[in-house]
């Protein structure tokens, strides 16, 4: 997360750290995710190397720091299923979204809980918040404590123009109607924030998941907002697959 601040532990209990086994056999944080319910997590498809080996990945919830996976608030979750959206193709992205089923249900409490998902297709506007353990500048260092930043949602037509022809060397130059763009100069999601939640909190304090971090250009680059998969466009696919 670029331009953000450290989140208060427990403020965002739906946040997930997705970790991948490295050559030493230990696990590194690679992506964020959001708890949808006790069995399912939503994340980005590009987090997983294909062909997928489920045992190479784990999810952690209730983390204060990605270094401290043994604290008593933490649940370490093995994965029983990884469902990539059928429209997703590696290195190209219309449908960079994936569901993870955990092997044992998540125990709900102060530090682990689901986030609401939109009921129908919505067109969010105004500001939204994105959180993650990703880098704090493009190619920069990763942080151990969860970061949060509030960013403006960019109107879709404007975003499509921004990522026009001249910029097609970026993977995400194809801005589809199933995407949301958000971000301002110096405030953005970044590498290793992928899959994490973009959400809005209403006057009653209820949070709704509106996007998952896809990619976008260099982090926090002034003219180019971050790109998110629009969750409300995928709720039918989600409910069909969360079985």
UniProtKB/Swiss-Prot annotation:
Q: Where in the cell is it found?
A: Secreted
Q: Which residues get glycosylated? A: 127
Q: Which positions form S-S bridges?
A: 31-47, 159-181, 190-219
Tissue expression, as annotated, is: Expressed by the venom gland.
Provide one Gene Ontology biological process annotation: proteolysis
The EC class name is: isomerase
Quote the PTM field.
N-linked glycan at Asn-127 consists of Man3-GlcNAc2-Fuc.
A cellular-component GO term for this protein: extracellular region
- In the UniProt record, does the keyword Repressor occur? no
Q: Which InterPro entries match?
A: Peptidase_S1_PA, Peptidase_S1_PA_chymotrypsin, Peptidase_S1A, Trypsin_dom, TRYPSIN_HIS
| Main location, first listed in the record | secreted
Q: Which UniProt keywords apply?
A: Disulfide bond, Glycoprotein, Isomerase, Secreted
The catalytic site is made up of: 46 (charge relay system), 96 (charge relay system), 194 (charge relay system)
What the protein does? Acts cofactor-independently.
**Similarity comment: family membership:** Belongs to the peptidase S1 family.
Quaternary structure?
Heterodimer with venom peptide isomerase light chain; disulfide-linked.
Protein name as catalogued? Venom peptide isomerase heavy chain
Organism, by scientific name, is Agelenopsis aperta (North American funnel-web spider)
């Amino acid at each position: 997360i670029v331009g953000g601040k450290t989140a208060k532990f427990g403020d965002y209990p739906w946040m997930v750290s997705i970790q991948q086994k490295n050559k030493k056999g230990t696990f590194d944080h690679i992506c964020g995710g959001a708890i949808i319910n006790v069995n399912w997590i939503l994340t980005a498809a590009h987090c997983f190397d294909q062909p997928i080996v489920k045992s190479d990945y784990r999810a952690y919830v209730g983390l204060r720091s990605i270094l401290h996976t043994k604290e008593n608030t933490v649940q370490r979750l093995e994965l029983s299923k990884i469902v990539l959206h059928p429209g997703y193709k590696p290195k190209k992205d219309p449908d960079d979204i994936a569901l993870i089923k955990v092997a044992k249900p998540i125990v709900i409490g102060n530090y682990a809980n689901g986030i609401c998902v939109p009921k129908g297709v919505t067109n969010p506007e105004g500001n939204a918040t994105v959180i993650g353990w990703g880098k704090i500048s493009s190619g920069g260092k990763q942080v151990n404590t969860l970061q949060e930043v509030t960013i403006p949602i960019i109107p879709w037509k404007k975003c499509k123009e921004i990522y026009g022809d001249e910029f097609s060397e970026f993977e995400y130059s194809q801005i589809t109607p199933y995407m949301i763009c958000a971000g301002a100069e110096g405030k953005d999601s970044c590498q290793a924030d992928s899959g994490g939640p973009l959400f809005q909190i209403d006057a009653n304090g209820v949070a709704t998941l509106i996007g998952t971090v896809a990619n976008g250009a260099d982090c926090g680059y002034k003219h180019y907002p971050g790109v998110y998969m629009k969750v409300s466009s995928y709720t039918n696919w989600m409910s069909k697959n969360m079985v």
